[in-house]
Design a protein with these regions (language model features):
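Active-site groove signature of glycoside hydrolases
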Residues: 128-176, 301
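Aromatic-lined carbohydrate-recognition surfaces of secreted/lumenal glycan-active proteins
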Residues: 178-220, 260-270
Length: 383
């Protein structure tokens, strides 16, 4: 289950780094960051463990006591609408711990919500409402995890850079993918309005690249990866600095464009090779990201609960100084600025490369026509 979170970020970061490095090209200065004034932020800890493991973890008295003391919530993934998952939610309801229904698809449908399975989403939510009513469950909010399907990640992971490039180019040209993305946006927008109508507080969990796509005024990532910029709910950008360890600079850059921020990852996956490359955040990195995220929003998601417990983060938060200042080094700001510049260029190229190819072909044809016309003219003059 842990690899479900690790693979998307690892592979997508590889996609965007395919044509660009991470060297800095701008001149920045160190930045000091504090949390925004007012009430302390609410943390929501994501838990995507199996039912048995989640039940054991969330039955621990010290975990429940810490969550209640700190007024923090849980986002529990709901891959199946069964009695086991319902029992966990009922326990959290009894303890007055806010629970977010982290909605996902069954694994056979790709696990994440996206353009490819959008037609199944309304039925999935209808089943959720039936399940909720059956077990009398209470929800603080309901979240849609919108990411590319797991099958896409497996294909991209095993195919190598050349196969990845071919697939990306093919999808960027596909009118079918374009129409699918447009239809999916309407479906998810309508679904979010349905959630609101039925009294839920909807959220969407989006990859951080969604902010770059918006800035470029493009829909190319929707077409290539199937992600959908659904509107109407609280959008949380998943800004996981554990995949590049540039510190809070990543959160600082994307936080300006986020209504809510999810930070992580505090836990590794089942794949040791990925763990070596994308190690979990340590306490210093985690606490710096927390302060930086709190500079922009009162709602902060944390992936994952199990990782925080393994590293004793939850307990340490009881004495955490939310008024501390975090220094973001200029070097880290430079790296993130360059990374986002590369991402922006790639989005632009992927959006318009076919037009550039057509222009180049036309220029070649024009050059050949001029060359041929001059050659014919010279022959006539000689004759």
């Amino acid at each position: 289950m842990k690899n479900i979170i690790v693979y998307p970020f690892a592979i997508l970061i590889a996609c965007f780094c395919l044509f660009g490095g991470c060297t800095s090209t701008t001149n920045q200065v160190d930045i000091q960051v504090n949390r925004m004034p007012g009430v302390l932020p609410q943390l929501i800890f994501a838990c995507d463990l199996s039912t048995d493991s989640a039940e054991i973890l969330l039955s621990r008295p010290e975990v429940i006591n810490d969550l209640k003391l700190l007024h923090y919530g849980i986002a529990l993934s709901i891959p199946e609408y069964d009695s086991g998952r319902a029992k966990i939610v009922q326990h959290l309801n009894q303890e007055d711990i806010p629970v977010t229904a982290w909605l996902v698809m069954p694994s056979k449908l790709g696990y994440y919500f996206n353009a490819s399975n959008a037609s199944e989403a309304p039925g999935r939510f209808a089943d959720f409402e039936t399940w909720t009513a059956t077990y009398k469950l209470r929800w603080a909010s309901v979240g849609l995890d919108i990411e590319p399907g797991l099958t896409d990640f497996v294909v991209l992971q095993k195919g190598g850079k050349l196969k990845l490039l071919v697939k990306v180019i093919g999808r960027s040209l596909s009118l079918e993918r374009k129409h699918q993305a447009q239809a999916a946006r309407q479906t998810y927008d309508s679904l979010i309005q349905w959630m609101k109508k039925d009294g839920y507080s909807p959220q969407t969990y989006q990859l951080l690249f969604m902010a770059d796509e918006r800035k470029a005024q493009s829909m190319i990532l929707d077409r290539i990866f199937g992600i959908v910029p659904a509107k109407g709910g609280l959008e949380a950008l998943m800004v996981y600095s554990s995949f590049n360890h540039v510190g809070p600079a990543l959160v600082y850059s994307y936080g300006k464009e986020a209504a809510a921020i999810s930070i992580g990852s505090t836990s590794g996956g089942d794949d040791s090779s990925l763990n070596n490359q994308f190690r979990p955040l340590n306490w210093q990195e985690f606490s710096n990201d927390l302060i930086c995220a709190s500079h922009f929003t009162h709602t902060i998601g944390v992936y994952s609960l199990q990782g925080c417990l393994q590293q004793d983060f939850l307990s340490r938060l009881k004495s955490f100084d939310w008024n501390q200042t975090v220094l973001i080094p200029a070097k880290s700001i430079d790296k993130v600025a360059h990374f986002r510049k590369v991402v922006g260029i790639l989005i632009w190229v992927l959006s318009y490369w076919i037009y550039m190819v057509i222009i180049v072909i036309l220029l070649i044809v024009l050059f050949f026509w001029i060359w041929r016309a001059r050659r014919i003219k010279r022959k006539k003059m000689k004759g």
